[in-house]
Amino acid sequence: MRRTLLRLLPVLAPGLAHAQDHPTVWLRVRNNSQEVFEHVWQGLPRTRSDVDLGPLRPGQTSRWHAVPATLAHYRKTRIQLAQRQLTDVTDTSFPQGRATLEPGRYTFAYTLEGDALRLTVIPEAGTTAPDR
């Protein structure tokens, strides 16, 4: 029975097997603005690594989600506001000026400055990765 379950694991839980083989970045989004984010999406739609995070009220933080630790999978965040949609292309906001994120956990905190999004990337060193 145990051998059968081990052989079936890649079929039953392909994401779990994939996550163990590749470095992972855990992300969440925080609304640090005074305006409601009516909808938030993050990721790369063409590779099915995009995540629908739903609405975020001011001060609210989304759930954690995991993506491969490759820039393309966490480079874009789209935020729907009451009258417009904004897209943030994340290329220069990483800790210590790095071009990509190291595997780990991060909060993407967004504020609005005029008609633009401002991102602060917060490494979450003391947290543990939540269950998927």
What are these regions (language model features)?
Residues 1-10:
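N-terminal export leaders
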Residues 9-19:
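Hydrophobic h-region of N-terminal signal peptides that target proteins for export
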Residues 20-63, 67, 76-132:
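Intrinsically disordered, low-complexity segments enriched in small/polar residues
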Residues 72-74:
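Extracellular Ig-like/FN3 beta-sandwich strand-entry sites
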